[in-house]
Each structure stands twice: as C-alpha cells, then as structure tokens.
Amino acid sequence: MAQTSVSRPRAETLVNDFVRSVYNWMAIGLCLTAVVALYVSGNEALTRLIFGNSLIFILLIVAELGLVFAISGMVQKMSAGTATFLFVLYSALNGVTLSFIFLAYTQTSIVSTFFVCAGTFVGCSIYGWITKRDLTSMGGFLMMGLIGIIIASLVNMFFRSPGMSMVISYIGVIVFVGLTAYDTQKLKNMAMTQPVDADGSVVRKGAILGALSLYLDFINLFLMLLRIFGQSRD
C-alpha cells in the first residue's frame, strides 16, 4: 500500500509532464509556422518563386506529406532528436506553403479567425480529456470524413465551385472538431499508460507524435474556418 501511495503522485507527475511537453511542442510548431508564413508573405521574391512556379509548390506539398508520413509511421525507429528535427522542419515548410493566407485574406479576419479557432480547439480538447465516453468508435467515421474532404477538394480544384468549397469547409470544421477531441483522448490514454520507468527518448518521441496530431487538427480547423469567415483582400 505504501508503494502505491508513493507511485501515484509520481505517475501523475509523469502524465502532467508528458501532456505539457505535447502542448509545448505543438505551440512551438504553430509559432514557427506563423513566423515563417509572415516572413515569406512579406518577401515578394520568395512569393513569386513559390507561388509563381507550380512545380516548386507541388514539391513543397509532397515534402510536407512525406514528413508527416515519416513521423507518423517511423517515429519508433528514429531517434528523439531526428523526430524533433523533422517536426520542426515540417512546421517551417508548412509556414512556407501557408504564407498565401496573408496574401489572400485581410489580417483582421486572419486574427479573428485564429481566436475563434483557438477557442474551439481548447473547448474540444478539454471535452476529449474529461469525457467518460469512449471516442474510439468515432475514429473510423472521422477518417472516412477526412478522406471524403480530400477527394472532394481535389475534384473541386478542377470545377472551382465556391458553393462546393463552402460545403467542404463546413464539413471540414465538423471533422476536425471531432478529431481534436478524439486525438486528445488518445493522448490522454497514451500519457496514462506509459511506464513509470519509460526511457526519456521514447517519451519525447511520443510527445512529438502527439504534438503533430494536435498541430494538424489545429491548422486544418483554422483553414476551414478561414474559408468560412475570412475576408478576401480583393
């Protein structure tokens, strides 16, 4: 009994440290993305190079997708330092490709949408953490919704339908609201089931993987909301 009473505070400390690490790395990724996006959008030569050459833009997108798949699928096979570097690199590259939002939307609408997104994200994350309901069953439904969004977005690249784009955005908000709660509960389960004597590098890699999931939820939720509430510069 004495050992249990000693280990419980220790376990709670490990959970808190792990969750704090996840959200810290997520925040670092978001800040880096924002800084890079602002810098690129303010550099006319860079914007012409990136958005004036479709090949370069496509290569950047492919590189980003490759980094996401590498971190998600091979994180256990790489060192903690490599996983951290790839996450930071992905955040920076994402800032490059997302710099277009500062060219397409007014800064006022970007800022206001960010706060709406942040509030929504926090609320969904809190729900995912405190709810007693098992959200595992939502995973398959949400992944089907995500695949549907990707396919519909690719199709709409050819049709360029504003109405279809708006429908995709509303569905996207629903999907990423659900994914935020779902991924937060997964994060909670990961934090509470990690061994007390877990290796530091293993914990770091888990934190990077969790940060990537929440980062993607936040970024995509923000982009969907921006399509709905953003005010065009035109």
Question: Which sequence ranges carry the predicted segments?
Answer:
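A hydrophobic alpha-helical transmembrane-helix feature that marks the membrane cores
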Residues: M1-D234
